From Swiss-Prot:
Organism in which the protein naturally occurs: Nitrosospira multiformis (strain ATCC 25196 / NCIMB 11849 / C 71)
Domain of life: Bacteria
UniProt cross-references to Gene3D superfamilies, sorted A to Z: Lumazine/riboflavin synthase
Annotated transmembrane regions: none
Role this protein plays: Catalyzes the formation of 6,7-dimethyl-8-ribityllumazine by condensation of 5-amino-6-(D-ribitylamino)uracil with 3,4-dihydroxy-2-butanone 4-phosphate. This is the penultimate step in the biosynthesis of riboflavin.
Entry's Gene Ontology BP terms: riboflavin biosynthetic process
Protein's UniProt name: 6,7-dimethyl-8-ribityllumazine synthase
Pathway(s) of this molecule: Cofactor biosynthesis; riboflavin biosynthesis; riboflavin from 2-hydroxy-3-oxobutyl phosphate and 5-amino-6-(D-ribitylamino)uracil: step 1/2
Disulfides per UniProt: none
Enzyme Commission identifier(s): 2.5.1.78
UniProt similarity note: Belongs to the DMRL synthase family.
Length: 160
């Protein structure tokens, strides 16, 4: 649906058929991470991604996610990647460091490699907040990965 006459508007495309998706999940705060993963995988399948085209890697914590994403991106086997995990505030400043560094790392990998990465790393004050948000955020990460992979394909085709 074009909003302006004579302007090409690229519509969001949530068709997951023929896409290869890599997922990196933190095992820290595993209950929230597993909830994110379940919702994410369910949404990927709902949007047509073949289960055989999804690769899951788990890492100890959120700070390890960017390196695993980078290694996956450099294989050139994935159309998009998804980062999943939960950073929950504790009694020390560590929360701020982990939240900031994991987010910066994900963004850096995305920009350095040109592979779209959906950031599904929750940052919450409590366990209850993480558990309340995990289903929505997991599904959202799946849709973001699919949409951005398709947008990248469309833009790549326009370059030719």
């Amino acid at each position: 649906m074009a909003r302006y006459e004579n302007i090409l508007e690229l519509e969001p495309n949530l068709n997951g058929e023929d896409l290869s998706i890599g997922i990196v999940m933190s095992r820290f705060n595993i209950e929230a991470s597993e909830g994110l993963l379940g919702a994410c995988v369910e949404e990927l399948m709902k949007q047509g991604v073949d289960a055989g085209n999804v690769v899951l890697v788990s890492v100890p914590g959120a700070l390890e996610i960017p390196l695993a994403l980078q290694k996956m991106a450099l294989t050139d086997q994935f159309d998009a990647l998804i980062a999943l995990g939960a950073v929950i505030r504790g009694e020390t400043y560590h929360f701020e460091i982990v939240s900031e560094q994991s987010t910066n790392g994900v963004s850096t990998v995305q920009l350095d490699t040109g592979i779209p990465i959906a950031n599904g790393i929750l940052t919450t004050n409590t366990d209850d907040q993480a558990l309340a948000r995990m289903s929505q955020k997991g599904a959202e990460a799946a849709r973001v990965a699919i949409e951005m992979a398709n947008l990248q394909r469309t833009l790549d085709e326009m370059e030719q």
